[in-house]
Design a protein with these regions (language model features):
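The feature marks the mature, well-folded catalytic cores of soluble enzymes
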Residues: 16-190
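Short, low-complexity intrinsically disordered segments enriched in A/P/G/S/L with frequent Arg
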Residues: 10-13
């Protein structure tokens, strides 16, 4: 399944100019951050290694430390932009991309049965109508307990643990340099 392609530009009061990063050591003007959120609540001892964590951070402390860091950056004149706001801005500017985004997210989560694809889409669309709320939920992940149960008679459903993550959280988003970096007028996605 192809990745989402979007060649337009989101229009808003904070209309983003093109990316143009030519130095890794020059003055920082703008930074993309993600404030730790509910994705940390879906970390479990069993998922730590897979999600590249050594320990489960305590959410209130992680948020407090993040806020202090973001305030230091702002105090130095750096514009702080949040990843979740950028994603919501794109989806609000191009509403037709919402379902394509959800389909791609479900595909990337490894959901292959049509039953679960529909259950997850219905769950997201019914419970997260606001674009930013929907983006935040995709970052947080989905636990099997959250979804309505259907009697599907599929083997995968019969052996599933009630605490199983159906869609894994993305706790590494607050290390925004790890998944991608701006180089010149492009982006390197790792």
């Amino acid at each position: 399944q192809p990745a989402i392609e979007w060649r337009g530009r989101a229009r808003s009061e904070s209309h983003m100019q093109g990316v143009n990063v030519k130095s890794e050591i020059g003055n920082l003007k703008k930074v993309i951050l993600h404030r730790p959120g509910d994705e940390l609540l879906n970390l479990t001892p069993n998922t730590l290694e897979e999600l590249l964590f050594d320990d489960i951070p305590f959410l209130p402390v992680a948020q407090e430390e993040h806020d202090a860091f973001a305030n230091i950056l702002r105090g130095e004149g750096v514009e702080v932009v949040y990843l979740e706001d950028l994603m919501a801005e794109v989806l609000d500017a191009k509403p037709e991309l919402r379902q394509q985004f959800l389909d791609q997210w479900i595909f990337e989560a490894g959901i292959r049965t049509d039953t679960y694809k529909e259950i997850i889409k219905d769950y997201i669309n019914s419970n997260y109508a606001g674009t930013k709320d929907m983006v935040m939920k995709t970052m947080a992940g989905i636990n099997l307990q959250e979804l309505p149960q259907k009697d599907t008679h599929l083997l995968v459903d019969m052996v599933s643990d009630r605490c199983k993550l159906v869609c894994a959280p993305m706790p590494n988003l607050y290390f925004t340099r790890d998944p991608f970096a701006m180089i010149g007028n492009g982006v390197s996605i790792n």
